[in-house]
């Protein structure tokens, strides 16, 4: 009875803590990756320093999805996002001698991982890096994109994923990665396409009713 009451009651003094996938905290402030600007009619990214008056006006119930033990460098004054210095990420792309347009799209696709499928666009695509061993694929996936969130919030899709219950392992994450994918990926093509397009997918869970 006590467990049932605690799990279902709504109490302002005992709020339910839910991470915001668009909010990250740093030593010097909080970065909000999606904030509605009513005067412009668009969503924007904003950084709030802990000492600023605007930070004090933020909703205190907001929970950051991850804390980075470092200072945040605010480059909001730079007009073109392509001019923001990212030397380490650039080094991987430039080593492959990609054209600037290809490099730009690598950043675009990486940024889309911080949002739900179809949240800000209807492109129905996901990033996929193809290449030989030691070309930088896993470095970008596991050392950059995966670090956007805590390990518990990033699911891993293996090449030999269990056909029936495999998706249940990644359904609750903010992001999923697949570091090694071959031509014999065990995931059904129809399910994969539905995941990419943002359609409802029936997910079988052991000893439970299927979810979507």
Regions found by a protein language model. Name each.
Residues 166-212:
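Conserved nucleotide-sensing/catalytic segment adjacent to the nucleotide-binding pocket
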Residues 2-35:
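Extended, Lys/Arg-enriched charged tracts that mediate electrostatic binding to polyanionic substrates
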Residues 2-5, 100-101, 146-151, 189-196:
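N-terminal start-of-chain detector that recognizes signal peptides
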Residues 25, 44-46, 202:
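Ser/Thr- (and often Asn-) enriched beta-sheet segments in non-cytosolic proteins
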Residues 5, 9, 91-96, 195:
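Residues that form generic nucleotide/phosphate-binding pockets
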Residues 30-174:
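P-loop NTPase catalytic core of nucleic-acid-dependent motor ATPases
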Residues 1, 96, 208-212:
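Short, intrinsically disordered, charge-balanced linker/junction segments flanking boundaries
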């Amino acid at each position: 009875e006590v467990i049932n009451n605690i799990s279902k009651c709504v109490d302002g003094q005992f709020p339910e803590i839910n991470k915001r996938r668009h909010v990250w905290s740093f030593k010097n402030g909080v970065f909000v990756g999606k904030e509605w600007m009513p005067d412009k009619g668009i969503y924007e990214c904003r950084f709030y320093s802990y000492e600023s008056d605007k930070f004090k006006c933020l909703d205190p119930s907001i929970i950051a999805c991850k804390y980075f033990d470092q200072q945040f460098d605010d480059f909001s004054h730079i007009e073109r996002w392509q001019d923001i210095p990212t030397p380490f990420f650039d080094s991987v792309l430039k080593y492959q001698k990609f054209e600037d347009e290809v490099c730009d799209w690598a950043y675009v696709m990486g940024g889309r991982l911080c949002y739900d499928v179809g949240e800000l666009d209807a492109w129905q695509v996901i990033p996929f890096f193809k290449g030989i061993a030691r070309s930088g694929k896993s470095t970008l996936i596991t050392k950059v994109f995966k670090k956007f969130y805590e390990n518990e919030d990033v699911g891993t899709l293996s090449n030999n994923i269990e056909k029936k219950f495999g998706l249940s392992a990644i359904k609750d994450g903010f992001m999923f990665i697949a570091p090694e994918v071959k031509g014999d990926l065990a995931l059904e093509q129809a399910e994969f396409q539905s995941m990419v397009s943002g359609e409802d997918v029936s997910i079988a869970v052991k000893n439970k009713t299927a979810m979507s």
